[in-house]
């Protein structure tokens, strides 16, 4: 079992943790999140981005992690970036707790997300269905108020 964590923080009140667990290279990865300080009663996009570089804040993380050269999509779509995790829902206080399994996100192997950045966005991910060019790149999820590098967890 490989475990990883991203400690989320940035130039906003958004903070928290996103954890990853994968039993072996052929099993889905369980992704769990506990994020606070976001907009109340909202859906907000989150993605694994290409680089683990946060020297210029979350903008240094680059585009979505996309080793297979696909366009942006929903986590359940065949046509999607590896880093496309969709949206999480916040409660009346702006907090979000949840988990999901993902068959493309890996901690083991050549396409591992270890050392890359998990970015929490300011807007809702349109899952590549926005009808414009940016939708197929970013899901129109907006600015990057918080992020964290995905590192090996104890």
Swiss-Prot record:
Cross-referenced Pfam families: Sod_Cu
Disulfide bond entries: 58-147
GO biological process assignments: cell redox homeostasis; copper ion transport; fungal-type cell wall organization; intracellular copper ion homeostasis; intracellular zinc ion homeostasis; negative regulation of cellular respiration; positive regulation of transcription by RNA polymerase II; protein stabilization
Catalysed transformations (reactions): 2 superoxide + 2 H(+) = H2O2 + O2
InterPro entries listed in its UniProt record: SOD-like_Cu/Zn_dom_sf, SOD_Cu/Zn_/chaperone, SOD_Cu/Zn_BS, SOD_Cu_Zn_dom
Family per similarity comment: Belongs to the Cu-Zn superoxide dismutase family.
Subunit structure: Homodimer.
Name of the protein in its database record: Superoxide dismutase [Cu-Zn]
Organism: Aspergillus niger (strain ATCC MYA-4892 / CBS 513.88 / FGSC A1513)
Gene that encodes it: sodC
């Amino acid at each position: 079992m490989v475990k990883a964590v991203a400690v989320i923080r940035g130039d906003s009140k958004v903070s928290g943790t996103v954890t990853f667990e994968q039993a072996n290279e052929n099993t889905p990865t369980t992704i769990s999140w506990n994020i606070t300080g976001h907009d109340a009663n909202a859906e907000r996009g989150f993605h694994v981005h290409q680089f683990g570089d946060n020297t210029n804040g979350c903008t240094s993380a680059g585009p979505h992690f996309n080793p297979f050269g696909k366009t942006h999509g929903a986590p359940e779509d065949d046509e999607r970036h590896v880093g496309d995790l969709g949206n999480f829902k916040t409660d009346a206080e702006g907090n979000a707790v949840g988990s999901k399994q993902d068959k493309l996100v890996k901690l083991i192997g050549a396409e591992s997300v270890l050392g890359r950045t998990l970015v929490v966005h300011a807007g809702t991910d349109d899952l590549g269905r926005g009808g414009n060019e940016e939708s197929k790149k970013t899901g129109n999820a907006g600015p990057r108020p918080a992020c964290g590098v995905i590192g090996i967890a104890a």
